[in-house]
Every structure is written in C-alpha cells, then in structure tokens.
C-alpha cells in the first residue's frame, strides 16, 4: 500500500503497474489498488494497519511530514524501527518515481499504462480517517 500511494503521488506510471501486480499477489484487495490508482478513498474495512499505512504515506508524500496522530499509530503498531523503515521505503520510491518522471522513462514493454495523470507532478491522494483504528 505504501509503495502504491507513493508512486501514485508522484504520478509515476512506469512504477505503478508492477507494484500493483505485486500488491495483488500479496493479497491487497483489487478495490484498494484501483482506488489508489484512480484517486478515490480506499475502503479498508477492518484492515486498520493498511489504512494507517495509506494515511501515513499519503501525508508524507503530499506534505513532507505526517500528523502526530498517524505517526503515533504507526509507531504503536510497528515500533520506532518500523516507522523509520516505512519512511525510508516511501523516500526510496519517491526517488525512483522522480527519476522515472524527470527522465521520461516509459512503462516497460508489455505492461499497460495505468495512470491517467502520468508524469504531471504530485497527485493528491484523498485522506482516510483512521481514528477508529
């Protein structure tokens, strides 16, 4: 979820399709992947961990920081090391996405283009309320 939100946030078309496939294979529901792709609010149902990761990643990509409440939720669930690793993952995929965008690297052959706004800078993912999580 974090990778999808990050590369979607940077509108990196070439980097969305492969992680989307991997996320589906890892068990992320297709409706969540599609919501992230289209910019709709994902319905996480009872998957509070995924909702927190979504919110953390969306805030970090859009604002360069997160609200204390979501940071605290991530630390409570994953620990300080987990929060650092999640931040590093988002930072790494931000760098990859920016590199693909600035050098106009196309989607790999055989992989369909999936983003409607590709390479157009930051895309604002809607927030999801995780206060109930």
Enumerate the language-model features and the residues they cover.
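Hydrophobic alpha-helical segments
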Residues: 1-133
């Amino acid at each position: 979820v974090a990778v999808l939100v990050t590369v979607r946030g940077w509108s990196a078309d070439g980097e969305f399709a492969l992680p989307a496939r991997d996320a589906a294979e890892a068990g992320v529901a297709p409706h969540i992947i599609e919501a992230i792709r289209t910019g709709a609010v994902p319905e996480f149902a009872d998957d509070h961990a995924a909702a927190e990761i979504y919110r953390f990643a969306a805030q970090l990509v859009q604002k360069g920081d997160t609200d204390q409440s979501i940071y605290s939720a991530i630390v409570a669930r994953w620990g300080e090391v987990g929060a650092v690793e999640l931040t590093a993952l988002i930072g790494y995929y931000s760098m990859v996405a920016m590199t693909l965008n600035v050098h106009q690297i196309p989607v790999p052959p055989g992989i369909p283009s999936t983003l409607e706004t590709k390479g157009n800078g930051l895309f604002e993912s809607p927030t999801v309320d995780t206060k109930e999580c």
